[in-house]
Amino acid sequence: MNELVNDNLYETRNNLVKEITLLSDTEFNRKPDMDMWSIAQVCHHLVLVEEASIKAIAWGLKGNDRTSTERKNIHLTLLDRTKKIKAPKIVDPDAAPFEVPQLIDLLNDSREKLLAFLSTIEDKAILKEKSVKHPALGELPLDQWIEQIYLHEQRHIEQIKEIKLLLDVKH
């Protein structure tokens, strides 16, 4: 994994944790609307997406074929919040309430699993040569599966900021 991707994973996760650390559990779990997720649910969704991404990359690596596909401008899709993307059921968050420290632990655990998994890949070049279909982005090279983790997280940090405004949360 190149240094820029690693830095982006680190910086984005730090920004996410800064957004949620000072929230009370009530603020964390309050939904601004019945049809919207709470901040806790957004964070749980991010954990589930990171874990699902590990599985997708692992599955792609097991395939014998070099299924190289064109690189996509995934940032255009993921960072454009005017384009709504319906989450697949497998990454739908729990409705049960969470405590802020509990979810920070889950976020840390999923990131540790991701980094540990990536460290087992001896030849990182293979990540550009194989691909797996992403539910929202289509056929995606495995290295872009890693990029989509932090881009997707950046998208949801903006959503968290919007939810905080709707809930009139000051921190």
Range-by-range predicted roles:
Residues 1, 9, 15-16, 20-48:
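Long, hydrophobic N-terminal alpha-helical segment
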Residues 2-5, 96, 100, 142, ...:
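Amphipathic alpha-helical coiled-coil segments and their boundaries
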Residues 4-5, 11-14, 123-126:
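Metal-centered catalytic cores of metalloenzymes
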Residues 6, 10, 43, 47, ...:
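Short amphipathic alpha-helical segments with heptad-repeat character
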Residues 13-21, 50-54, 58, 111-122, ...:
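Structural signal for well-ordered, non-membrane alpha-helices
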Residues 21-33, 90-98, 112-145:
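Acidic interhelical loop/turn segments
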Residues 32-78, 127-171:
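Short, contiguous alpha-helical
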Residues 81-105, 109:
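Alpha-helix-centered segments that form part of catalytic cores
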